[in-house]
Structure formats: C-alpha cells, structure tokens
C-alpha cells in the first residue's frame, strides 16, 4: 500500500474525491472485520478507517459506541486488530488508517505503539482525544515510523488554531462537520461549505470531512463544496451490524459502491 499522502496525491491528480469508510474492529466479530476490509477495498474505498474498540469513546456517537462495546465484550484486543491488518494490508489498494484513543498509546509507550502499528501495515493514525498542544511527541514518533498523524479541526476552532492544526497535520486534515459526537445525520451541516474555503486559505493539504455523513447525497454535497475526501462511519457500522455477518457485508458492499458512485 502507498502512504496516505501519496494516495491523496494520486487521487488529486486524477481529480477524484476519496471515499473513506470507517468500521469498528471486532464487530460483529474479527472474521467479519477481516472480510469487511477486503470488501470495502473492492467496493471502491480509497482509504479505510479501522476503529480500535475502546471503553470510553468520547468522540463516538451511540452506533459506534455500541459496536465498540460489543467488540470489547468479546475480548477484542489491539493485538488481534493488528494481526488482521498484518494479514490483509498487502492485499488492499486502500491504506488502513487506525482510529484509536490516546490512552492505549500512552499505556504501551508512544514509540513502542508506533513501531507496533507500523510493523503491522498501518499507514495513518487518527487520535480524536489528542489535543494539538500535546501532539508533538506523538507526531515525532509517528513520523519516525513512517506513519501519518491526521489531526482534527472542529467547526468551532478559531482561525489561529485552524492554521496551527493544518500546519501540523499529516496525510490530510480531518474536518469535523458538526460539533459533538459521530453519528449519521439527516443533513450535512451547511457550515462545512463555509469552513472548507477558510481552510483552503491556510493550507494546500487534502481535507477529509467526517462526522454525520449518512448517504450518497450528503457525500456528493461535500464533494461539491470542495472536500478532498468523505469519511463515513456510523452509517457503515450500522449496516455491518444488521442481520447475519453475510447480510451485513452485503449491505456494506452495496452502500460503499453507492457512495463511490455519488462522488465519482
């Protein structure tokens, strides 16, 4: 797989908007997670966000929280998640971006964690509870192991903070479309249409928009507003958890294909 930055560069040269689906590792089970990574890749995902289940996921809405709770109840560990990445990453076109909270990183040791996930084949990291002020040590460790640390910009961030985050973020900038937690919503916040040009004034890095995208029409709207990537989480997780694992995988495949078509 190519790095996050390189992949975005090739997409931009082709005039394409990136599709970035999210799934929670271990929900409904580890075997389905492994299959889902392959199915999402085949269905057109340009990157795949893989969430490590965590007991106190402050940024996540009810759908992803419930998925994490189910995975943890089955005893899913980071080591099991990385074992899946190790097995499948070489078969995928889409780089895998690990979505994890900071505590597991701190617990293992920052450099040791980065070495472990990089060795497994992870290409990027999103750490939603890592504030900019405390990110330099994590950023340095990620860089030393060839990982892109993707930082989040909130819609309420003042201009100075937006500039600082945009400068520090690697791979792309994760623009949070709404205040609050993740979760599918019936419409995309119109403020995103105002925030994208504001970000463009301070950076030429790719911008991915997430939190609340639930259908192809919303994905298309974000592309029209100028997003370089569209991140879809809860709507994918919900489909994967519906019915039997086979039914969930089929639903995710169909949904991902419809999203890809919408932003083509």
Swiss-Prot record:
Matching InterPro entries: Aldolase_TIM, RibuloseP-bd_barrel, Trp_synthase_alpha_AS, Trp_synthase_suA
Record carries keyword Amino-acid biosynthesis: yes
Origin superkingdom: Bacteria
Protein name: Tryptophan synthase alpha chain
Top-level EC class as recorded in UniProt: lyase
Keywords of the record: Amino-acid biosynthesis, Aromatic amino acid biosynthesis, Lyase, Tryptophan biosynthesis
PROSITE patterns membership: TRP_SYNTHASE_ALPHA
Quaternary structure note: Tetramer of two alpha and two beta chains.
Pathway: Amino-acid biosynthesis; L-tryptophan biosynthesis; L-tryptophan from chorismate: step 5/5
One Gene Ontology term of the molecular function aspect: tryptophan synthase activity
Bridged cysteine pairs (disulfide): none
Free-text function comment from the UniProt entry: The alpha subunit is responsible for the aldol cleavage of indoleglycerol phosphate to indole and glyceraldehyde 3-phosphate.
One Pfam family hit: Trp_syntA
EC number(s) stated in the UniProt entry for this protein: 4.2.1.20
GO CC, any one term: cytosol
Catalyzed reactions per annotation: (1S,2R)-1-C-(indol-3-yl)glycerol 3-phosphate + L-serine = D-glyceraldehyde 3-phosphate + L-tryptophan + H2O
Active site positions: 49, 60
Similarity-based family: Belongs to the TrpA family.
């Amino acid at each position: 797989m190519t790095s996050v930055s390189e992949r975005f560069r090739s997409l931009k040269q082709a005039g394409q908007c990136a599709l970035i689906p999210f799934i929670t590792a271990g929900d409904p089970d580890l075997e389905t997670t492994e299959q889902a990574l392959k199915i999402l890749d085949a269905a057109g995902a340009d990157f795949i966000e893989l969430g490590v289940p965590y007991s106190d996921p402050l940024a996540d809405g009810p759908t992803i929280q419930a998925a994490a709770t189910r995975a943890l109840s089955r005893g899913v560990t980071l080591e099991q998640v990385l074992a899946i990445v190790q097995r499948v990453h070489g078969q995928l076109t889409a780089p895998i971006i690990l979505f994890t909270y900071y505590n597991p990183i701190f617990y293992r040791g920052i450099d040791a964690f980065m070495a472990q996930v990089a060795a497994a084949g992870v290409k990027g990291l999103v750490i939603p509870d890592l504030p900019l002020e405390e990110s330099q040590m994590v950023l340095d460790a990620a860089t030393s192991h060839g990982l892109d640390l993707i930082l989040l910009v909130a819609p309420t961030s003042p201009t100075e903070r937006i500039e600082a985050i945009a400068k520090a973020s690697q791979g792309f900038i994760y623009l949070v479309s709404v205040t609050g937690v993740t979760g599918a919503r019936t419409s995309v916040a119109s403020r995103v249409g105002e925030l994208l040009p504001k970000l463009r004034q301070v950076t030429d890095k790719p911008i991915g928009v997430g939190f609340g995208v639930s259908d192809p029409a919303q994905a298309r709207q974000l592309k029209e507003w100028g997003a370089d990537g569209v991140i879809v989480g809860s709507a994918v997780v919900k489909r994967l958890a519906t019915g039997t694992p086979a039914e969930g995988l089929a639903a995710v495949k169909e949904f991902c294909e419809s999203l890809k078509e919408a932003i083509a």
